[in-house]
Amino acid sequence: CCGNIGGGGFMTIHLADGKDLFINFRETAPAAASADMYLDKEGKLIKDASLYGYLASGVPGTVKGLDYALEKYGTMSRQQVMEPAIKLAREGFVLTRADTDVLDTT
């Protein structure tokens, strides 16, 4: 599906009736984006402007995409789906050594 709520993704769904669906909820360009936003005053391409810096950002689509899939094809309420994560956020959880090893960047 996706990597995190700050990005976007794709989802394939196989329904009980055998129908297969594909949902694209990748990041989208901001509303103020324009066709010439990566060009300098002379109309030449600004190197790497689409890769780095504030002009390279997109509007995340993950939350909208997951919500769309749940609303259109789901069988549970948003509350039911989110309850386990809400419980973990409220009560916390113990990390295993394997968890901390993955998170260790030193």
Annotate each PLM feature.
Residues 1-106:
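Noncatalytic scaffold domains of N-terminal-nucleophile
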